[in-house]
């Protein structure tokens, strides 16, 4: 089912400062920076080998990411695993007793669908399944 780690999502308070850190200190450049109306966040992706680092800054104080930052502060928010079919994976995992946040996948970008698993079922880690069409 899981093919590989796609990315690690990190919640940040200031995306510009976080980008500066990754560029100047770690020496890597973002491959994509965009604002997501769906997640109410500004996002930057940094390729690092076969895995990407996703930096996420909320743009709305009522968003899920803003609430996460308020409660836990900056840091790792989720791990995303690539799968062939998010919806069939969600069905299979629910049959195995995994609690789901999403019963069906959601389209987050033109060619991507995602679904989240409840951290209570995944050792305290918010887990995202991602499918690229």
Predicted regions and their residues:
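N-terminal beta-strand motif that seeds the catalytic metal site of vicinal oxygen chelate
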Residues: 1-19, 74-83, 133
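Short, solvent-exposed interaction modules
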Residues: 69-95
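Short loop/beta submotifs within extracellular cysteine-rich repeat domains
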Residues: 18, 26-29, 52-53, 61-64, ...
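Conserved active-site tyrosine of GNAT-family acetyltransferases
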Residues: 18-23, 46, 93
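Vicinal oxygen chelate
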Residues: 44-45, 81, 90-133
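A short beta-turn/loop motif at secondary-structure boundaries
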Residues: 36-38, 71, 106-109
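N-terminal strand-loop-strand beta-hairpin
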Residues: 27-48, 52, 116-118
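Conserved secondary-structure micro-motifs at functional edges
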Residues: 47, 55-65, 73
């Amino acid at each position: 089912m899981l093919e590989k780690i796609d990315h690690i999502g990190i919640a940040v308070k200031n995306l510009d400062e976080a980008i500066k850190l990754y560029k100047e200190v770690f020496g890597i450049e973002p491959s994509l920076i965009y604002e997501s109306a769906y997640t109410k966040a500004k996002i930057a992706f940094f390729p690092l080998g076969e895995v990407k680092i996703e930096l996420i800054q909320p743009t709305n104080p009522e968003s899920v990411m803003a609430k996460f930052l308020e409660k836990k502060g900056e840091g790792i928010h989720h791990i995303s695993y690539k799968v062939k079919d998010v919806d069939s994976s969600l069905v299979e995992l629910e049959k195995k007793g995994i609690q789901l946040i999403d019963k069906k996948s959601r389209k987050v970008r033109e060619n991507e669908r995602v679904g989240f698993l409840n951290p209570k079922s995944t050792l305290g880690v918010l887990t995202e399944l991602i499918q690229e069409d």
